[in-house]
Amino acid sequence: MFPEYDVIVVGAGHAGCEAAAAAANMGSKVLLATMNMQTIAQMSCNPAMGGVAKGQIVREIDALGGLSGIVSDKSMIQFRMLNRSKGPAMWSPRSQNDRHMFAWEWRMQLEALPNVDFWQEMISGLIVKNGKVCGVRTGLGIEIPCKSVVLTNGTFLNGIIHIGEKKLGGGRTGEKAATGITEQLVELGFESGRMKTGTPPRVDGRSLDYSVMQEQEGDENPSKFSYSKQTTSLTKQRSCHITYTNQAVHDTLKEGFDRSPMFTGRIKGLGPRYCPSVEDKINRFAEKERHQIFVEPEGWNTVEVYVNGFSTSLPEDVQYKAIRKIAGFENAKMFRPGYAIEYDFFPPTQLQLSLETRLVKNLFFAGQINGTTGYEEAACQGLMAGINAHKAAKDHEALILKRSEAYIGVLIDDLVNKGTEEPYRMFTSRAEYRILLRQDNADLRLTPIGYEIGLATEERYQDMLLKKHNSEKLVEEIKNTKIKPETANEILEENGSAPIKEKVVLYNLLKRPNMEVSLFAEKVEEIKTLIEPYTQEEIEQAMIEVKYRDYIDKEEQMALKMTQLENMALNPDFDYKKIQALSLEAREKLSKLKPATLGQASRISGVNPADISILMIYMGR
């Protein structure tokens, strides 16, 4: 009934879709197995992509040849570049999306790939022979052979939904949980744990009073995620709105605490620290008089609204009473209550940096199964697992991105070397090379890698080379352009910058704070003519290069030093217990995690700089 597939992907959420698309586009014959083909690529929580650090990840996925950026652009209803008031390392693209268009667009992208087959059924087990996965077993007992497997189970592994004192099995509201895989993996020697996440109620937008809320419009000149010509920026957008909780809301919520599964101890799993439930917020931050609520439309042509900031597992009657005390929500009609969900995950220290498991060869994990939270975090893991599952099926060397190359590299390195006790989400602060890892240069960093492995297209590669050439050419032209005091001083003084007394190179003026080439182009014909041939993206790239070159140089030097440690390979079979000079914790952690390089060893929690020095001495370095 089934051929032997190169790659079988279990689960069709954000991670599974990226994994299937990547492996298929690289030439693998792929089977994407899902319990329900009507729920492929669901936005289970908020209808948005990107945000701080997450937007950089979406652009990195796109630069490598993944599809999340294209799908996000095609389903976008609003675009905002966050943190524009800060330096470019902090700029983060974010979109509001049409939930149904997003899922539909993902399905269209997958169905357009001849190498992807679909199968609708629960996968209940793996076929493992001699320590290597060689197929999957379905709930009906069908065995499907393959060379590698990617597990992207999301919140479905033994999922339990909590609403007040009610508890029901499920991986998402209205969908059953997945069973069998956790139990088999534990039998094989894997360690498992439980995590929790939650979602807010959805309400009828027709019942809200937006006049008392603060409107939050999209950017005046919206950008997009994808570097591809397949997508265009929005010409019209839908607004979001901001309102706040108040003391009456808090008091009403507190009335339900005795029936809250979080406070009564029925929920054992840890929830996401940076996306707490509303009851957790008012309990932990009792001194705060109000908490911000973002009112987000679910799409172009729907009245359904997502109440961002009001995630809860309190009883539905308490949710209803409390939500109606928020300004603008006095007459709110609820479509469905919020809920919490508990699910199995597997501590990611059981993985290699390729996302292949240490215990079972050619078996890869991606997404929430690894303890992460967020669509973007899941999608990038799916992309890397799909790439490496394809490579494993073909007996090729795995692709591993460095911390200095991508936020994706930071995320996977953190998971594998440090593990996580709570749902992990990405922040710019987690990256030590964030000036190198900007959202504007993801294509310059990663498209050459995507092209080399056969994922990014020739057209994308040539577009990247053209952008690189043109932005470098513009920087050189700026360095060779001199500007007279009588031309420059008016512009300088208008923008609070000291005047000049003699001809100055434009490059030096643009290094000053608040000085942009566009300010000079508005008033100086020569400079207007200079930048006219270039795209906005090329101009922005050149300006970042002009202003931040000194900082970029410093980070590149730091990254080079770390690369030297990364190039010092460690024997995976080395016996660390015999080096008594190492701390006991270092011996235990190094023996368990078996780092591939000295650089990886240096980032393991519990391994200190003294331990690394001892290893270097032992290696004769």
Curated annotation (Swiss-Prot):
GO molecular function (one): flavin adenine dinucleotide binding
Positions annotated to bind NAD(+): 271-285
Binding site for FAD: 11-16
GO biological process, one term: tRNA wobble uridine modification
InterPro entries for the chain: FAD/NAD-bd_sf, GIDA_C_N, MnmG, MnmG-rel, MnmG-rel_CS, MnmG_C, MnmG_C_subdom, MnmG_C_subdom_sf
Keywords in alphabetical order: Cytoplasm, FAD, Flavoprotein, NAD, tRNA processing
Database matches in Pfam families: GIDA, GIDA_C_1st, SAM_GIDA_C
Subcellular location: Cytoplasm
Any one of the GO CC terms: cytosol
UniProt cofactor(s): FAD
Subunit structure: Homodimer. Heterotetramer of two MnmE and two MnmG subunits.
Purpose of the protein: NAD-binding protein involved in the addition of a carboxymethylaminomethyl (cmnm) group at the wobble position (U34) of certain tRNAs, forming tRNA-cmnm(5)s(2)U34.
Protein name per Swiss-Prot or TrEMBL: tRNA uridine 5-carboxymethylaminomethyl modification enzyme MnmG
Native species: Cytophaga hutchinsonii (strain ATCC 33406 / DSM 1761 / CIP 103989 / NBRC 15051 / NCIMB 9469 / D465)
